[in-house]
UniProtKB/Swiss-Prot annotation:
Subunit structure, interactors included: Tetramer of two alpha and two beta subunits.
Organism: Agrobacterium fabrum (strain C58 / ATCC 33970) (Agrobacterium tumefaciens (strain C58))
Keyword Protein biosynthesis: yes
Reactions performed catalytically: tRNA(Phe) + L-phenylalanine + ATP = L-phenylalanyl-tRNA(Phe) + AMP + diphosphate + H(+)
Gene Ontology MF terms: ATP binding; magnesium ion binding; phenylalanine-tRNA ligase activity; tRNA binding
Main location: cytoplasm
CDD domains, A to Z: PheRS_alpha_core
Record note on cofactor: Binds 2 magnesium ions per tetramer.
Gene assigned in the entry: pheS
Cofactor(s), names only, from the UniProt record: Mg(2+)
Coiled coil: none
This protein's name: Phenylalanine--tRNA ligase alpha subunit
EC number: 6.1.1.20
C-alpha cells in the first residue's frame, strides 16, 4: 500500500467516525487546511521533476478531490440527521386533547368576536375590509358626507373637537365610520365593495350609549347597484349573523344626509323573554340604517353620479352584540371586569367561520 493509499484510508476512517458537524469540520481542517496532511503533500510538488510532478501531482489532486467530496457528503448527512433529531425532539402531537388549565386564561372580547363574525360574513360575499383614521378633518367627517357648513343635521352629533390649528381649522374624533367611504372612493375605482369596522366617538354616556363606541358599515358602488341589491345583502347578513333560516324585515323611510332615499331597518323578533329571539315572534327591533348613496357624496368621492350609484348601511357593533348575546348594559363592555369577560367572552381558539359556526 502506497503512502497515498494509507493516508486515504486513514482520512476515510476519520470521516466515517465524525459524529457531528464540529467533528467533520475538524477532519476537514486536518486534511485540507493550510497545514493539513493533503495540503502538505501538495507543497512537495514544487521540489519534484516535471516527470514526477505529472504522475505524483495527479494522484495527490485526485486524493484531494475524493476527500473533499467525502467530507461534503458526510457534512450533509450529519446536518440532515441533526435536523431530524431536532424535529423529533420538538414534535407536538396535535391529535392529543389540550389539557384544561385549573383556570382558563384569556377571553376574546365580545366586540372583537362580533367584528370577526361580521367580516367573515361579508368576506364570503366578496367584500374587503377598509379602515381609516380615528382623528378626522371636518371635511371628511361632515362636508364630504353632505353635511355642509351650518347644516342642521350636524346638530345630530355631539362631537369631540380638537383645538383649532394655526389655520383656524379644527379636527374631530370621528362621529361615524363613514369618512372611510370618501377616502376609499378617492383612492379606488369602482366597483367598490367594502365593510368598515371601527371606533367612533360622541359625547353620550348611559346604559345604551358610550363616549367611545364601535360601528360597522358597508358600501357598494357600481353602475347598476339598486335597492333590491341592498335588501338582499342585508337579509343574507341577518340570517347568517343571527343564525336563523329566515328573517322578516321591514324598511321604514328615514333621513340621513349621506343617503337618498334613506331607510331604518327593523327585523321581526320575539321579545317576550330575557333574550331577544330573531326569526320568530311578532315584535320588531330596529337594527340598522341604510340607503342609496347621495349624489353629492359620490361627487365628493370623485365619482360621476350619472355613471355610478351605490348603497350603504351602518350599525352599532356594541348594540348588535348586546342583542345577539343578551348583554344588558353597554358600559360593562369597557369596565375591564374579569368576571364579566369570563361570562361573556369567547375562547381564543373559537374563531368564527361560516362552515364551523359563527358563535360556537
Amino acid at each position: 500500500m502506497t503512502e497515498l493509499d494509507t493516508l486515504k484510508s486513514q482520512l476515510m476512517s476519520e470521516i466515517a467516525a465524525a459524529a457531528d458537524e464540529p467533528a467533520i469540520e475538524a477532519v476537514r481542517v486536518s486534511a485540507l487546511g493550510k497545514k493539513g496532511s493533503v495540503s502538505e503533500l501538495l507543497k512537495t510538488l514544487g521540489s519534484m521533476t516535471p516527470e514526477e510532478r505529472q504522475t505524483r501531482g495527479a494522484a495527490i489532486n485526485q486524493l484531494k478531490t475524493e476527500i473533499t467530496d467525502l467530507i461534503g457528503e458526510r457534512k450533509n448527512a450529519l446536518k440532515d440527521a441533526a435536523i431530524a433529531a431536532r424535529l423529533k425532539a420538538e414534535t407536538v402531537d396535535v391529535s392529543l386533547p389540550v389539557r384544561q388549565s385549573p383556570t382558563e386564561r384569556g377571553r376574546i372580547h365580545p366586540i372583537s368576536q362580533i367584528v370577526d363574525e361580521i367580516t367573515a360574513i361579508f368576506a364570503d360575499m366578496g367584500f374587503s375590509i377598509a379602515e381609516g383614521p380615528d382623528i378626522e378633518t371636518d371635511y371628511y367627517n361632515f362636508t364630504a358626507l353632505n353635511f355642509p357648513e351650518g347644516h342642521p343635521a350636524r346638530e345630530m352629533h355631539d362631537t369631540f373637537f380638537f383645538q383649532p390649528d394655526e389655520k383656524g381649522e379644527r379636527k374631530v374624533l370621528r362621529t361615524h365610520t363613514s369618512p372611510v367611504q370618501i377616502r376609499t372612493m378617492e383612492s379606488q375605482k369602482p366597483p367598490i365593495r367594502i365593510v368598515i369596522p371601527g371606533k367612533t366617538y360622541r359625547q353620550d354616556s348611559d346604559a345604551t350609549h358610550s363616549p367611545m363606541f364601535h360601528q360597522v358599515e358597508g358600501l357598494v358602488i357600481d353602475k347598476k347597484a339598486h335597492v333590491g341589491n341592498l335588501r338582499w345583502v342585508l337579509e343574507e347578513f341577518c340570517k347568517t349573523f343571527f343564525e336563523v333560516d329566515s328573517v322578516v324585515m321591514r324598511f321604514r323611510p328615514s333621513f340621513f344626509p349621506f343617503t337618498e332615499p334613506s331607510f331604518e331597518v327593523d327585523i321581526q323578533c320575539d321579545r317576550s323573554g330575557p333574550i331577544v329571539k330573531f326569526g320568530e315572534g311578532k315584535d320588531w327591533m330596529e337594527i340598522l340604517g341604510c340607503g342609496m348613496v347621495h349624489p353629492n357624496v359620490l361627487r365628493a368621492g370623485g365619482l360621476d353620479p350619472d355613471e355610478y350609484q351605490g348603497f350603504a348601511w351602518g350599525m352599532g357593533l356594541d348594540r348588535i352584540a348586546m342583542l345577539k348575546y343578551g348583554m344588558p348594559d353597554l358600559r360593562d363592555f369597557f369596565n375591564a371586569d374579569v368576571r364579566w369577560m369570563n361570562h361573556y367572552g369567547f375562547r381564543p381558539l373559537d374563531m368564527p367561520t361560516l362552515f364551523g359556526g359563527l358563535s360556537v
